Amino acid sequence: MKLRTIGLTVALCFFAGAACFAADDPHMGTWKLNEGKSKLTPGEGKNTTVAYEAAGDQVKVTIDGTDKDGKPTHNEWTGKFDGKDYAVTGDPKSDMRSYKKVDDHTLAMTVKKDGKVTGTGRVVVSADGKSRQVVTIGTDA
């Protein structure tokens, strides 16, 4: 597979838009894109708001943004940070996603479409919990 960088170093810095939902998990809450501190790949879409919230014993991740043409996007994922695949709804580029906790501030993510890995990445929340960095790498499946 030929690798291509989606978001090159999609050093997406986000700032918490609301108080943390769960004090023991720095990922929880609503994160908003700070374009001034982000390195976005030209011609790609962007996630402007990402919300993590408790859903029973799982986590619901809701992502809103725009596609490469500026049209609104919305997708949702509900699952656990256990490295297993859970369904994604609303995203034409993926149908499954998994997150796995690397440490208290880092999640590893894998994105799939039709059973094939189409992307991997990491989500890292800063030590002070006020920003996060998302780096993704896509593959030509």
Residue ranges and their predicted role:
Residues T9-A18:
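Bacterial N-terminal signal peptides
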Residues C20-A141:
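Hydrophobic small-molecule pocket/channel-lining residues, especially in calycin-type beta-barrels
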Residues M1-V10:
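Bacterial N-terminal signal peptides that target proteins for export
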